[in-house]
Amino acid sequence: MTAGMRNSSRAARSALILVAAGVLAVGCGSGSGSSGASGGSSSGTGTAASQVPTANLPVLKSIGKGEGTLNLIAWEGYLQPEWVNPFEKQTGCQVHATYAGTSDQMVALMKNGGGGQYDMVSSSGDADLRIIYAGDARPVNINLIPSWKQFFPAFQSPAFNTVDGVHYGVSLQWGPNVLMYNKKDFPAPPTSWSIIYNPKYKGQVTVPDNPIQIADAALYLKTHNPSLKITDPYELTQNQFQASVKLLASQRPLIKKYWDLASQEISEFKNGDATVGAGWPYQVSALKGVKFPIGAVVPAEGATGWADTWMLAAKAPHPNCAYMWMRYISTPKVQAEQAVDYGETPDNKLACPFMNQIQQGSCEEFHANAPLSYFKSISLWKTPVATCDNGQPDCVPYSQWQQAWTTQVTQ
């Protein structure tokens, strides 16, 4: 997920995303898996829906003639020729991609409503509400996207992209952040995230250069330091926050590279510079595609993860092409193509047969009938805010996460 087009092999398929149709039909209950896929509120931002600056902007009533251009901000790997080229031929909308390496970069690119340059962004749950409440996304007429009705209920109007019943985009895919390892160095799969904090692997660890990693540390401490009483890795008291930052600061001497781009982590493993690290199914898929002995697991402590949305920029210069894209990318066939190529889970519940057409058994391989317990083991990204979900102003806001990451962790 970042900058620079990824040349992934269609033969490289990740078997890491485990979620069932029955799971998503239930929705995201309480606990770690519930952070972004329920309701239609501000998801604990403490900000009233009336404060969304663009809430009353008019929406398209019908899709008109395409403008010929579509400017997208995307995670690396989200705009592969397999599905972009047919879209361009069908619509006449030529896709121009700008790749971002972090959610912070996406938020920055979307400032001032995309600046009249960008049409859409494939943002994750830790960025969506920042973009929405900054007035940089505009409401979407979900009725112009027929395949939206085929989505699992949990992703039709999730709290990370829908505020007070107003949609600011259309859900796309979701997946976990996984523990990657070189099978030659680890004949037996690691079972705990503790391996990336182990001094034994000094200079061999790679993790994202992203403040949201503080949540990964908090999730680890939730199990290994229960006295902290962490219940949600994105809602941390000052004491819980400092403990998580301290753990990451102690990890710094072990880090070979804080990667900004997915392609950087791929290179670290291919070159033998990294033997273990935190990454996405995309990197796993790409490395498998070149026959690299990569392994990946969701350890016993669980994992953080993302749920992505194609959000419409407030000043999108090509709205008709943007709506055409949302309609196209939401269809089961295209969702299946991206899911199998990237190694993530589609939001369209009808994508499964198309996945098996692309790669026989891939729907089962991605554990589409996984138990609810797996879904709950994934803590989906959301924006840390000062007001906790219990209404108390005891949580550390994201601005302090950013500051701690740059001043206490990576430097």
Give residue ranges: language-model regions.
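Bacterial signal peptide processing site
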Residues: 29-32
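Paired acidic/hydrophobic, glycine-rich loop segments that form the ligand-binding mouth/hinge
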Residues: 117-122, 258, 275-280, 295-296
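Mature extracytoplasmic/periplasmic domains
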Residues: 313-379
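Extracytoplasmic/periplasmic substrate-recognition and gating elements
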Residues: 279, 288-341, 411
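Extracytoplasmic ligand-binding site segments that recognize negatively charged/polar headgroups
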Residues: 71-80, 105, 117-118, 122-270
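Early extracytoplasmic/lumenal segment of secretory-pathway proteins
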Residues: 44-131
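Conserved C-terminal helix/tail region of periplasmic/extracytoplasmic solute-binding proteins
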Residues: 41-45, 375-411
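C-terminal motif of bacterial Sec signal peptides marking the signal peptidase cleavage site
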Residues: 23-27
